[in-house]
């Protein structure tokens, strides 16, 4: 089984109402997508506006420098002028889209089926004459007569396209039909590979993507956080996790998805719901007492994969649903030993206040002190994580400073960022003294003018 990801956050994602990426943000997102390992990046429709054009131009520069490794795709209407604009940017592939359902042919294009086939063939051939790979997107393919859709795919193949994307433009497919559709296309149109572009109008985009893989699709179109027109398309983090679980294939670096999701959340201005799969705040937090007891004994009782797979950690809520196992574990993690009687008393206090949404560690310590009559001293954390923002001197090359920082003991990750600071450094230390030494080592690096340290209190 072969399957990869085309991420369209920079094209489909920016079609989310209210979302606009700056040129710098487009470049940063492209670098992050490449780092996470997506096979293709749909970088935008360059004929739409100058900022998209400039963004793709800068992305292609990074591609030539080897800083981006994903295949870069430029979007285009089936119009020669659009194709020329994409071709002059020297993208790796041009994706030409055209509505092929009867409703699109009549209401939008005002052409016959035969005329549409001629347009598709002519524009694909024209794009190929510029020396680029071509994908054809059968817009509204899911509502297209099957026999005609097969003709469309054969026309695209014969004109030079090596891929055809079947777009479920209004999100009406369901898994059984999706599997049958792709199985038929793969069988009837040899010599062509197929993508699925699944919209989520009925909440079935991920399920349809999995079914398409079973039917023979080799590329899944995604956006980070499921952004896109109306209710969006397949979320990258969700389909990547599902493909790993069901097919055993790691299509991207799963442990980098959280960071990528947070980056796109920040730049898009669209917040992730806390109960969002994989990257939402609650994705690996347990609440019910019986759930927590199970997880403490064996995490797989209530987790499909370990949170560490995705760069996350598990946690649980302390409130009226909490059982004694969870309470004992929480106090042990705080370094506080309570007797069974004392634990029962603390639990009774918690359950006597059922309207409290959750109890923080400091709240639990206060309750325990009131129950025991003792002053309780929690142990300091065994490991300290911190994020250190670094500002560089104006006359230095930021990347050179980044390289110097990356070799300092205790430094786990170094990222060049936009904003008031130039670099973000993730560090881990055994104790405050070691953390202070790491900070001093960072400040001593040539080109560093100032730092700001933030301690990591909790990871979701």
Swiss-Prot record:
Residue numbers binding Mg(2+): 12, 197, 199
Classification via SUPFAM superfamilies: Aldolase, Dimeric alpha+beta barrel
Catalytic activity: acetyl-CoA + 2-oxoglutarate + H2O = (2R)-homocitrate + CoA + H(+)
Active site: 291 (proton acceptor)
Full protein name: Homocitrate synthase
Record-listed E.C. numbers: 2.3.3.14
Binding, 2-oxoglutarate: 11, 75, 135, 169
Pyruvate carboxyltransferase domain ranges (all copies): 3-258
InterPro entries the UniProt entry points to: 2-IPM_HCS-like, AIPM/Hcit_synth_CS, Aldolase_TIM, Dimeric_a/b-barrel, Homocitrate_synth, LeuA/HCS_post-cat, PYR_CT, Tscrpt_reg_AsnC/Lrp_C
PANTHER family linked: HOMOCITRATE SYNTHASE (PTHR10277:SF63), HOMOCITRATE SYNTHASE-RELATED (PTHR10277)
A Pfam family assignment: AsnC_trans_reg
Gene3D superfamilies according to UniProt: 1.10.238.260, 3.30.70.920, Aldolase class I
Transmembrane segments: none
PROSITE patterns: AIPM_HOMOCIT_SYNTH_2, PYR_CT
Enzyme class: transferase
């Amino acid at each position: 089984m072969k399957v990869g990801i085309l991420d369209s956050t920079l094209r489909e994602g920016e079609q989310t109402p209210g979302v606009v990426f700056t040129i710098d943000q487009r470049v940063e997102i492209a670098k992050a997508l490449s780092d996470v390992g997506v096979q293709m990046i749909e970088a935008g429709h360059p004929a739409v506006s100058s900022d998209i054009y400039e963004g793709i131009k800068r992305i292609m520069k990074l591609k030539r420098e080897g800083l981006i490794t994903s295949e870069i795709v430029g979007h285009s209407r089936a119009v020669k002028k659009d194709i020329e604009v994409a071709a002059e940017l020297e993208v790796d592939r041009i994706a030409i889209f055209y509505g092929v359902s009867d409703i699109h042919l009549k209401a939008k294009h005002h052409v016959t089926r035969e005329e549409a086939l001629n347009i598709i063939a002519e524009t694909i051939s024209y794009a190929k004459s510029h020396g680029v790979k071509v994908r054809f997107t059968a817009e509204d393919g899911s509502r297209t007569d099957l026999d005609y859709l097969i003709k469309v795919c054969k026309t695209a193949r014969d004109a030079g396209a090596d891929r055809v994307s079947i777009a479920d433009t209004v999100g009406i497919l369901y898994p059984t039909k999706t599997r049958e559709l792709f199985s038929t296309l793969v069988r009837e149109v040899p010599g062509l590979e197929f993508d699925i572009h699944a919209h989520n109008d009925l909440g079935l985009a991920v399920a349809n993507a999995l079914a398409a893989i079973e039917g023979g699709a080799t590329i899944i179109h995604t956006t980070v956080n499921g952004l896109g027109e109306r209710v969006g398309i397949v979320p990258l983090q969700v389909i990547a996790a599902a493909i790993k679980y069901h097919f055993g294939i790691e299509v991207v670096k799963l442990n980098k998805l959280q960071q990528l999701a947070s980056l796109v959340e920040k730049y898009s201005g669209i917040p992730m719901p806390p109960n969002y799969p994989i990257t939402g705040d609650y994705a690996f937090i347990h609440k019910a007492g019986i759930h927590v007891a199970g997880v403490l004994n064996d995490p797989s009782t209530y987790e499909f994969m370990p949170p560490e797979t995705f760069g996350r950690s598990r946690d649980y809520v302390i409130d009226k649903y909490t059982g004694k196992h969870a309470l004992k574990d929480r106090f042990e993690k705080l370094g506080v030993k309570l007797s069974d009687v004392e634990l029962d008393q603390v639990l009774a206090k918690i359950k006597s206040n059922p309207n409290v949404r959750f109890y923080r560690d400091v709240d639990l310590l206060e309750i325990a002190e009131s129950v025991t009559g003792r002053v309780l001293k929690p142990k300091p954390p065994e490991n300290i994580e911190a994020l250190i923002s670094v500002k560089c001197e104006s006359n230095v090359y930021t990347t050179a400073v980044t390289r110097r920082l990356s070799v300092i003991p205790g430094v786990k990750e170094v990222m060049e960022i936009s904003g008031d600071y130039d670099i973000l450094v993730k560090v881990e230390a055994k104790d405050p003294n070691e953390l202070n030494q790491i900070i001093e080592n960072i400040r001593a690096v040539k080109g560093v003018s100032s730092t700001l340290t933030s301690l990591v209190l909790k990871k979701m």
